[in-house]
Amino acid sequence: MNLFTDFEARIKTALEQIDLVREKRSELDFGRITVEPPRDASHGDVATNAAMVLAKPLGSNPRALADVIIAKLKEDADVADVSVAGPGFINIRLSVGYWQRLLASMINSGTDYGRSTLGAGRKVNVEYVSANPTGPMHVGHCRGAVVGDALANLLAFAGYGVEKEYYINDAGSQIDVLARSVFLRYREALGERIGEIPSGLYPGDYLVPVGQSLAADYGVRLHNMPEEQWMPIVKDRTISAMMVMIREDLAALNVHHDIFFSERTLHANGAAAIRTAINDLTFKGYVYKGTLPPPKGQLPEDWEDREQTLFRSTEVGDDMDRPLIKSDGSYTYFAADVAYFKNKFDRGFDEMIYVLGADHGGYVKRLEAVARGVSNGKAKLTVLLCQLVKLYRNGEPVKMSKRSGDFVTLRDVVEEVGRDSVRFMMLYRKNSEPLDFDFAKVTEQSKDNPVFYVQYAHARCMSVFRQAREAFPGLEVSAEDLAKAVAGIGDPAELQLVAKLAEFPRVVEAAAQSQEPHRIAFYLYDLASSFHAHWNKGKDQTELRFVNDKNRESSIARLGLVYAVASVLKSGLAITGTAAPDEMR
């Protein structure tokens, strides 16, 4: 049960019972009505602006209209008190019985509490990471990997049909450079002294095993071939090896994609997919031949002072038209972007989300233009940009790069502080804001370390059940038993904790609609704070302790509350991709 959706429906029902509202119903926009927690919890449990947004079209005073609405709401047995505040806000306080039934609903739902049908099964493609397959993942890839993965988890929890995708950039000139770098390592494996790696090639030692595997499989045969013959062989082997490495790096971060889409497939069969995409835009009148004026600032790679085949992207929201085919007849990188979007659209996705680094800010408008042009405005495209992560150790900056060819890898960070610390902290700030990651702070066992604080709350919940089994030997209670015992919950401090749990479905839907998975991390910290605060109250107020070995009935009732807290923590942590431990040592 979603408390706020429930009371939104009740408020609208109350409005429909007012004669003046019924008379002017066609002129009223109920969509402007909000139902949310009041800013000050002392004002009540639910607040609505219904009187304020409807007063003007009804020709009424907001406070006067609020009084009429209040009279209707007072007829609801689940409303303990209702009042008007300020210019016309209506504050509602709920009955203890309502909170108890809501808690029972939470217990019965378990980890499905908060799950939503908001998405109604709409297909969403979330593409994230998509790092060039030229080496191991570095720390700069961490944030986009976590944000994209958590967003995909969040959307799935909110009822969307989600596919997680990785676009392999395996068709560009950097892959030729990578293959030449590996070929050098292959020659080294054959016994040749290669000396210092030439400038422009990839110097990393991670390429040595690839060269060795080629030497083991081909001997000197590749060495005797011209480049045009050995290049495709070395490319295939290298890309395969790099993707194995990248998948292992991502798995260490608990990131698993459903689809790995190769850019090379767009160029296969004479670039048939790209030609088809351009033909489609041509049919719609978006393609022409022309010469672009030089843009201000640094010239993009695909600009040239010659006639090219262009996408009329300014007609669909872009700042400038974009080259599709160069004057020499070759396709631009952007042309592959068009074909890739068309591929996603043809696969039936209603919405595509691209999670990119902040350095890709210039791509946003052109990608949005592609979406409008290819889908005729039917598909939605969103680009989320992730700002930089700065590494610190005890407040001192950590160099991102070490010596040439060596750098701080994603695996380095995960192995030092743990997967859960990396994932949760990468979400503990909005993706559009820079993030400071301090190795020392994320391993502290204190309130100042959010991941520890939240996981510790779940572990504490599990410890309560162990205490209960010690206090009452042979105790076995099911979720159904706990749900039936909620009548024992009624202390204001306990109801405050239930109220915090009741926010979860609303947070899930709001986070999914705004595509902001960090909201889940923030909520979990708030819930953990509420739970720890209630735990601490029990130290001084024995009547608030979760387990009272002299009162089995009240203990079981409170176990239900603990079960609900643990379930929401576990669900929220699962969305973030973080474990919910039963114990912490």
From Swiss-Prot:
EC number(s) recorded for this UniProt protein: 6.1.1.19
Main location: cytoplasm
GO MF terms, alphabetically ordered: arginine-tRNA ligase activity; ATP binding
Keywords for this protein: Aminoacyl-tRNA synthetase, ATP-binding, Cytoplasm, Ligase, Nucleotide-binding, Protein biosynthesis
Entry's Gene Ontology cellular component terms: cytoplasm
Motif ('HIGH' region): 131-141
PROSITE patterns linked: AA_TRNA_LIGASE_I
InterPro entries: aa-tRNA-synth_I_CS, Arg-tRNA-ligase, Arg-tRNA-synth_N, Arg-tRNA-synth_N_sf, ArgRS_core, DALR_anticod-bd, Rossmann-like_a/b/a_fold, tRNAsynth_Ia_anticodon-bd
Top EC group: ligase
Highest taxon, organism lineage: Bacteria
Cytoplasm found in the keyword field: yes
Catalysed reaction equations from the record: tRNA(Arg) + L-arginine + ATP = L-arginyl-tRNA(Arg) + AMP + diphosphate
Gene3D superfamilies: Arginyl tRNA synthetase N-terminal domain, HUPs, Isoleucyl-tRNA Synthetase, Domain 1
GO biological process: arginyl-tRNA aminoacylation
One Pfam family recorded for the sequence: DALR_1
Subcellular location, record wording: Cytoplasm
HAMAP family: Arg_tRNA_synth
Family (UniProt): Belongs to the class-I aminoacyl-tRNA synthetase family.
Cross-referenced PANTHER family: ARGININE--TRNA LIGASE, CYTOPLASMIC (PTHR11956:SF5), ARGINYL-TRNA SYNTHETASE (PTHR11956)
Subunit field text: Monomer.
UniProt name for this protein: Arginine--tRNA ligase
Organism: Rhizobium etli (strain CIAT 652)
Lineage per the UniProt record: Bacteria, Pseudomonadati, Pseudomonadota, Alphaproteobacteria, Hyphomicrobiales
